[in-house]
Each structure stands twice: as C-alpha cells, then as structure tokens.
Amino acid sequence: MNRTSLFCFAILTSTTLAFADEPARPAPKPKPSEILEKTWPDHPEWVAMLVDILQGSQLGPGEGWFKKAVSQTRFTWDATRKELDKDGDGSISKAEFAGKAADFATLDRDRDGLLTAPDFDFSPHALTPSPGMMLFYAADRDGNGKVSREEFEGVFRALDSGGLGFLSQDDLRRAFSPSGPRPRPSSPSPAASGPSKWTLVKGLFRQEIGSLQPGPKLDEAAPDFALLTVDGKDALMLSKKVGPKPLVLIFGNFTCGPFRSQAGNIEKLHEHYKDRATFVMVYVREAHPTDGWAMESNNRVGVTLRQPRTYDERVEVARKCVKTLDFDFPVLVDSINDSVGARYSGMPGRFYLIDPEGKVAYKSGRGPFGFKPAELEQSLVLLLKQSEKPEPSKKP
C-alpha cells in the first residue's frame, strides 16, 4: 500500500469506522469525504470511488469512478463521420465505407444499411437488464459465459412446467421481463443487503474492485511488460507482440461474474479476428474472493476461492479459469503485486486496443459496467480499415 493509500486508510479508520459509543466532541469534524475532496481537488478516480463508498454507495453504474472512467476511442461517431461521410448527409453508406462488406455489417448495428450515430451509441452499461441477457443467465448453468445446446434445452424444460411441449408468448414474457422473476443461476447478484462499507473499502485498497491508478490514456504508448504464460512455458513481452497487426489486450479474473459472462463473446471475437489481430489476456487479482466481497452467484456455479497469496496460487487459479472458459489465445499471469494490472487499471476487467505503432487506440471503461466486447469490436473494425491495405478492385 502506497502513502496515498495509507493516508486515506488512516482517515477512514479514525473517523468513519469509529466506535458508536465514542463520546461526542464539542465541534463537529469534517467528514472523511470532505477531507479527501479538499486534499485532492483534481478528484482522481480512486478518490471519487472512496468518497462515494463513504457516502453509502453500493458501486452502481454512474457512481464512484464509473462516472469518470468511461471508454475512450479514436473512432467516435464524429471522427468516423468526418473521415468517411463524403457527401455530408450525416450517414455513411456502404460505398462511402469502401471496406469489407462483413465489417460494414458489423458496424451497422441497427441493420438499416447505413452507419449513423445510433450505431455508435454504447451508453447502456454492460449489465443493463434485457430479455436476451436474462435468457442467457438462465441458461448458462455452469457460469462459463457460453450456452450449450444442452443448457438451452434445460431452460425449455424448466419453463415448460405443464409438460405441454411448447412455450407460449406469455410464458417467455413472464420469465424474461426485466420487472418480473426469472431464474438466474449464474447472474452477478450481491447479497440482498449489499456489501458493507468496510468490505468495499478493503476491496478498494486491495485493488480487488479496481486499480487505484487510471491506466494509460488514449493515444499514449502502451506500457511495456513481460509476464509468463499460464502454462509457465513462455515469457511474453508486450512490445514483441505490437505490430504489424492490432493487438487486443484483455484483463480479467475468475471470480468476476460479469467477466466470465463475456467469455463467449470474447472467444467469438478471437475466432473471427484472429487472422487480422493479436489477442493477449492478462490474468489479474480476484474481484470477489471468499475472503473479500464474496458473491452468492459465484457459490451457485462453484467458483469459490480465496485471494491468492502467492504467485503460484494465482497461476493455479488462472489455469482453472482458462480451462473453464476455454480460451484459445495466450493468457499471461500478473505478478502477485499486480504490477501490470495496476499500471493498466485492469482490475477487475478491461479491454485495450493497441495499434501497430504501440499506442492505445481504444480503452474500455472500468469493469464490470464498461466491459463491452461489442464496443471493442467496433473500434477494432475501424482500426483494421485504417491499417490494412485495401483489397485490389476486380477488373470486369
């Protein structure tokens, strides 16, 4: 723990967590949150998080550092429109895009045949409830982020309570309405009362709920590092992986349910773009160990483990994670003092897209709310359009 952390920890333990029977003082002292904001007027991300925790936040979207640590990309709608909207009509046609048809289809999220501002709107956070998400969590019985045919059929059997062999519209509406009850075997859900303030403060300073550092900014050089692969056979240096293709850098850990839930999306991205981009994951500190902010949703799928105390223990957990999620790209294990995860602000989960020159072209928001594979894919597609040579036109 650095000096800043120790200072804040002292403030917290000497004020907020004082015993209830402490005799009243004649003059009220300033609240810890007021002291923090006065001491750090620039209000860095970790201060925003600590202040909100002290004020009773349960770390929902838009609270703490989540309102500051939003995604950054070169490929905003304004930047993309300025580059590709040749006729100035406020949209980008297939002809104006002049790239791969499959890439255009990926960017055209509303399937209207044009690229427009709504296609670039990823403002809903990654855990925003939807019928599709509810169906996914109901089906993903083992919590590995992928729904198998057997799991999908299991949902049908569970919902067909009358044994009629079919489901009605109302059956599905009741099961997967955002306001109605539905089965959630693997969905991320804290205890009904929520974590205590002390649990959240410990999680903050242990860097379990996130790094105290903000990480590199857009267009900055990606900090170099060298880590061992999860099997211990190779040492991989980031700078050796940079160029000629874009590099997708993934941070995550096993006890982060939202990270696990995105495993299928991550694997599909890798399968689709593995010939055009390099994928590397860094395994970081556990977000929800049993000796920290434990989650009942982890218990339901058998992901129960304490925070690793040694590098070897972290490697063992990382191997379980890779085996369960079945990732087919290099997975590196961060040092036990979180040297890479802290520098990149990678805990509990985060994406970076690094261009062939080694600079950050896209940086996701902090996980879990900012951990959006589809948003990453959009920036990847547009970076590929810039970095790949155009296909030669076919002569008639």
List where the protein language model places each region.
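Bacterial N-terminal signal peptides
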Residues: 5-16
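Bacterial Sec-dependent signal peptides at the C-terminal "C-region" and cleavage site
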Residues: 15-24, 396
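Thiol-/selenol-based redox modules, centered on thioredoxin-like
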Residues: 198, 202, 335-396
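A short beta-strand-turn-helix
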Residues: 226-247
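Aromatic-flanked redox-active Cys/Sec active sites in thiol-based oxidoreductases
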Residues: 250-256
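Structural microenvironment flanking redox-active thiols in thiol-disulfide oxidoreductases
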Residues: 258-325
